[in-house]
Amino acid sequence: MTEKKNRREKKNPREAKVTFEGLVTEALPNGMFRVRLENDTIILGYISGKIRSSSIRILMGDRVKIEVSRYDSSKGRIIYRLPHKDSKRIEDSKDSEDLKDITDSKD
């Protein structure tokens, strides 16, 4: 009897997910977004039910936490929108690098 019980125990489904931080680059219909992760991969993100029911707005340029499955790394669930003061702007750093390159080439 105890052997069957051990076989039926379910593992925590959250263990199969990895959490990343990313930047929303494009808003798509039906609560879908393109998100650029910290490692520069772009994935499709959808809003979790808790965020949807709380009516939290997610816009382009927002930093978000996203859960990605280990089995399908092309899609993820947006679980948290980071406050603007805590977020470091990836776009700003890349734009400033581009500006430095342009000004260096003019000299």
From Swiss-Prot:
CDD domains: S1_IF1. Its main location: plastid. Disulfide bonds: none annotated. One of its GO terms (molecular function) is translation initiation factor activity. This is Translation initiation factor IF-1, chloroplastic. One of the essential components for the initiation of protein synthesis. Stabilizes the binding of IF-2 and IF-3 on the 30S subunit to which N-formylmethionyl-tRNA(fMet) subsequently binds. Helps modulate mRNA selection, yielding the 30S pre-initiation complex (PIC). Upon addition of the 50S ribosomal subunit IF-1, IF-2 and IF-3 are released leaving the mature 70S translation initiation complex. InterPro entries: NA-bd_OB-fold (IPR012340), RNA-binding_domain_S1_IF1 (IPR006196), S1_domain (IPR003029), TIF_IF1 (IPR004368). Residues 8-83 form the S1-like domain. It comes from Lolium perenne. Component of the 30S ribosomal translation pre-initiation complex which assembles on the 30S ribosome in the order IF-2 and IF-3, IF-1 and N-formylmethionyl-tRNA(fMet); mRNA recruitment can occur at any time during PIC assembly. PANTHER family: TRANSLATION INITIATION FACTOR IF-1, CHLOROPLASTIC (PTHR33370:SF1). It is found in: Plastid, Chloroplast. PROSITE patterns: S1_IF1_TYPE. Keywords: Chloroplast, Initiation factor, Plastid, Protein biosynthesis, RNA-binding, rRNA-binding. Belongs to the IF-1 family. One of its GO terms (cellular component) is cytosol. SMART domains: S1 (SM00316). The keyword Transport does not apply. It comes from the Eukaryota. The gene is infA.
